[in-house]
């Protein structure tokens, strides 16, 4: 069971609410003797941190992470021991505010009604457990996960905002760090600046599509049928707040293709195949066939809906079932998809780490 | 861990290869005292059975299921006992054939290379474990799952074939059983007949999109963060052979929407809210918010790639890494998406059954 | 969750009732390319098979096992493929009999009342799912498990029957196969023959203690805290029907020892320590410290209660709660502990296989 | 998988090392709307806390627990929300000391060698993760677990120290809190005082047996075959540091009994059977038959070996494989079994809570 845990051999359990004392996670199953410093984790957290531009929530959180367990100093620096690694991030900006507006009303598009329907009560302070704040702990866990599969690089990019898609011909990974959108298309990033400003100023919000690419994934990761690599990626990405769709490789586009166009042909690699497998002449598969990695880049995309916290009044009901209107005040992200980029990377890194360990266990060294 | 098992309280473990002795599954965790006959399971299996029209593989399989355990006769008929229910389907048409073409060559778009990369060998007879034949056992398990959540109806439909989408205004569930495509749009079904005939005769294949709708799902099913109802649906649907994308409700379309357009507003229901929750004025959420069901219909779609078994020669490599061409002979489905409809229904039914039991355990009767 | 499944990377799911059509299991997670024949599995099953002496139930079951999936013929013989291995044993001797005596009465010491309390009904035919017949499938799975840890030998012995313990000085593994009790002490075996004959003729029954020894277990198997090797062994052995106690190494005897007497001292091995670790000067630990194997033999013991199916009338209640007496007719084992020996071996083999794979995944090759 | 997690619907994940910054746990799956205060958890922790008498380690730890998440204030006090409850205990007395003696030598009877064999390194400071300090977090989790099964009381007692067993005729639960041994036999407690003083002063240690009794367990908890209530109890109790044996009810004594003596006869209860089931005339079963609770008290015992930290020099090897002697200085428990009493209670409470939720999910309200 895994309500607040994901993974099998590499397992992450998260805890904490938006406006509680602290959030954190326990990373269990990390192999021993991996070099790990708090700075490496902080670096990833800083990429997700709110309040870094006018395009994300103005909540100010330092998101300073502490390692509580699972590492020790050795002659060659701080390393993992094989024991569970607990990470803690204290909440500092839970802004004391008036909750009367949302305490008894269900915000449309949020999990207010469903948490109440499930549990009979809900933590209304900042969304409680359903807040995207929880994703900070995923990014922290992902920083550890990145170290597990030798040679893997996991990078994400915003490839669509509203109806506007990037020009794939202009894809430049170096651009990602140069704009506040993690956008790999320089021109589109410039456009998004004014586009999103308009949305922000009008108090509205907009959806986005994120693409995560993992390069250097060895062939053979994944497992048959119900532990497919793409099945686990789908669950992991769909578990991110506000995600409504996931696709691998050609994705929904594959529905429009013929077998000739879709199936990726192969040619022998110049080097020996044993190491690298064949050269694929295309990658509609997104690096996964039959649930198992092909050795090509793993490519996953996910759709993030617009945040439902907007500044215009909305029809809803209160806890007593009476009709009312609700008016969301306070800080919000005009495009929550932006900060989902490092979260998506983290989830992909965690899934790959887990499958790397599982594959090593199940099939082992030859 | 769950290589060949899915679910938690309602758990299904499947086994068997395309051309082996038999396929089957073990359904564990089914509550006791549910009426269950072999005919009910057979009825669902017959909907998926190959060879029923010229648009699916001509393999002839009776797909006769046997119940090996977990039920007993009582005064009120045959019921489940709470013990694991084992189901067995013998393979009858494993057509003795010449495997020399595919034994040492990797079919593009199939799991041939990846199984070999993972395991160092593969069962090349009809695809072995990676064959869609395994999905018959899912349909059998799904027939049991359908009985668990009181009042739930799970139905699927083919909503797109190649670039051709159905007209949603013409959606009629009664049409599903009247054409060989599970298509709810009568006119489009007529079109698909000639369209797919052309593809079939040319030895090509085409992708499709399937939509599954579950009505009568009570509010409150699902669980936070890593056991979200949509996360589990995404994993379950992505685990179906050839699926490359999954979306819930507005799905990828949500990326193009503003917060005003996307968030589903609420109004009080005329009856008491306790039972049914509010009336939602739209269903972009696809019946799920924060990973938990809203009480609206749960709507999931998945994209099925075109089968890679086509009649034109394709570039590939052999097991020794040498370049070669491969030419797939034999039976195939011109649109594997068609038979994925009952499989998709079964997966959704299984996920709902599992979450119903988990919710009952976790939150329980008030 | 694991009602009818055990293990994580090496997972066994069993099904079937005593008097149903068939019993069987699905072994998932077995590494590929292991040589495996049906004869190897049958050999282990034959050691557990009933009706082989007058000291076990006279039920006649051929216990012929079939492999339904997960293996294929290769140039070097039949091997595992990495796919789930389904094993099936048809029930042949479910003797048509009159169940009226036990249908509505709860047999003391059996699971009759508890199954009814849990499920609201029970399969009264031969004990249904709670029958020891299920253990045949464990022995079959164990035969596969034995092949996974290189160099491991798992052997069991009956070391106590009623109050009579074997003389450990006379322990000879070769004796195990020479008497119907799996007893390693030749003299005690001769005594047991007349002792158990007396019990059998009087229609009574007696308890026993079984010891399982696994030699060749590499140091390092097991995992911290809640996945300790001894924790998993305890659960696995306690899951065998009629087992009421489990101990490792000195076991309950350790409660009477001082720290000086109990802790196993170490000396360097003549060979290099890297391979074999230190030489331990005693083995009170039973080969496990901190939940992790030391490299010494793993020693586990379990207590089996006397069967509650005896020929004297017993006080009980019926399904309506009325007082009554019950008189068990029919076949029974005067000492069910005897046939628990191969079952205990199988469970230990399965736990070791699982931990071997988990260790390889978690820590991997250096 | 569950290296540092136990339970399924009620799940506990623990973290932290003996001499690290903090220890803690995440309790996931706790039902919502349970009243829970930090004082209730602290009360249980205080019973286990070291340094309360001269018979336990003199390490001074306040063991002040903080609740980081999963609760909220309501009109009727602080309650659980259904979100994961994170508990944190800061380490305060990690006494800066000289580790040179144990850093490179393996202490006999400890997990030093095995952790090193598994992970290639170990946290030698106070035993790191293998220290009994981890059990404080179990007691904290157990305090929550106690609230889940309505009407259940879980109490433990020390029933044997070295070869000295209590007189069961003198059992008085009220005595438990009146002596530093959790001993229910007043006279034996007085004896233990001088007995253990002798052992303590000589720098030696001694083993013990603990009995845990759960009253008010409803009939029907547990699950077939591999999720038996006794199987889970065995794993849970064996996972406590230094435990070498577990038994239920008559336990190993059952091996010496005949079927007539062992099987618990039944008589109708004066009240209606529906609620309470039959009256059992004895409880050799320890409240569990076929892995499912009978409604009688659940009785489990476990054997705790003497601590291996003693003041006389012991033969061992160092990390280089060279022979050496080791001399354990510092604080230790002369009988670690004493503090295992509240830990055993906590584990039993957790297993019962988990099975209560699972039963409710699986079988549900009728």
Curated annotation (Swiss-Prot), chains A, B, C, D:
GO molecular function: chorismate synthase activity; FMN binding
EC primary class: lyase
GO CC entries: cytosol
A Pfam family per the record: Chorismate_synt
Note describing how the cofactor binds: Reduced FMN (FMNH(2)).
The protein's Enzyme Commission number: 4.2.3.5
Disulfide bonds: none
InterPro entries in alphabetical order: Chorismate_synth, Chorismate_synth_AroC_sf, Chorismate_synthase_CS
Entry similarity comment: Belongs to the chorismate synthase family.
Cofactor(s) listed in the protein's UniProt record: FMNH2
Binding partners and assembly: Homotetramer.
Name this protein carries in UniProt: Chorismate synthase
Keywords from the UniProt entry: Amino-acid biosynthesis, Aromatic amino acid biosynthesis, FAD, Flavoprotein, FMN, Lyase, NADP
Keyword Transmembrane helix attached: no
GO BP term, example: amino acid biosynthetic process
Pathway field: Metabolic intermediate biosynthesis; chorismate biosynthesis; chorismate from D-erythrose 4-phosphate and phosphoenolpyruvate: step 7/7
CDD domains: Chorismate_synthase (cd07304)
Function recorded in the entry: This reaction introduces a second double bond into the aromatic ring system.
Annotated FMN binding sites: 129-131, 241-242, 290, 305-309, 331
Residues engaged in binding NADP(+): 48, 54
Catalytic reaction annotation: 5-O-(1-carboxyvinyl)-3-phosphoshikimate = chorismate + phosphate
């Amino acid at each position: 069971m895994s309500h607040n845990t994901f993974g099998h051999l590499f397992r992450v359990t998260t805890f904490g609410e938006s406006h509680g004392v602290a959030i954190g996670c326990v990373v269990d199953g990390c192999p021993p003797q991996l070099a790990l410093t708090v700075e490496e984790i902080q670096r990833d957290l800083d990429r997700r941190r709110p309040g870094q531009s006018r395009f994300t929530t103005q909540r100010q959180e330092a998101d300073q992470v502490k390692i509580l367990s699972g590492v020790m100093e050795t002659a060659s620096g701080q390393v993992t021991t094989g024991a569970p690694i607990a990470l803690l991030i204290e909440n500092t900006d839970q802004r004391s505010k008036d909750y009367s507006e949302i305490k008894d009303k269900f915000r449309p598009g949020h999990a207010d009604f469903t948490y109440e329907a499930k549990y009979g009560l809900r933590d209304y302070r900042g969304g409680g457990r359903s807040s995207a704040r929880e994703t900070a702990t995923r990014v922290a866990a992902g920083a550890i996960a990145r170290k597990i599969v030798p040679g893997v690089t996991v990078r994400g990019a915003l490839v669509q905002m509203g109806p506007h898609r990037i020009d794939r011909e202009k894809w430049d990974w170096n651009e990602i760090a140069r704009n506040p959108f993690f956008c790999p298309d320089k021109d589109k990033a410039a456009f998004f600046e004014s586009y999103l400003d308009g949305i922000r100023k009008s108090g509205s919000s907009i959806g986005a599509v994120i693409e995560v690419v993992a390069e250097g994934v060895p062939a053979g990761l994944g497992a048959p049928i119900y532990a497919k690599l793409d099945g686990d990626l789908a669950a992991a990405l769909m578990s991110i707040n506000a995600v409504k769709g996931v696709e691998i490789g050609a994705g929904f586009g594959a529905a429009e293709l013929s077998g000739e166009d879709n199936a990726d042909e192969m040619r022998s690699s110049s080097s020996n195949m044993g190491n690298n497998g064949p050269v694929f002449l295309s990658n509609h598969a997104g690096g996964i066939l039959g649930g198992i990695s092909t050795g090509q880049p793993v490519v996953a995309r996910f759709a993030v809906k617009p945040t439902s916290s907007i500044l215009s009044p909305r029809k809803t009901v209160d806890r007593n079932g009476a009709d009312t209107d609700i008016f969301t005040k306070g800080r919000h992200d005009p495009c929550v998809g932006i900060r989902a980029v490092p979260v998506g990377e983290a989830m992909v890194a965690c899934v790959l780490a887990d499958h790397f360990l599982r594959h090593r266990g199940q099939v082992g060294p030859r």
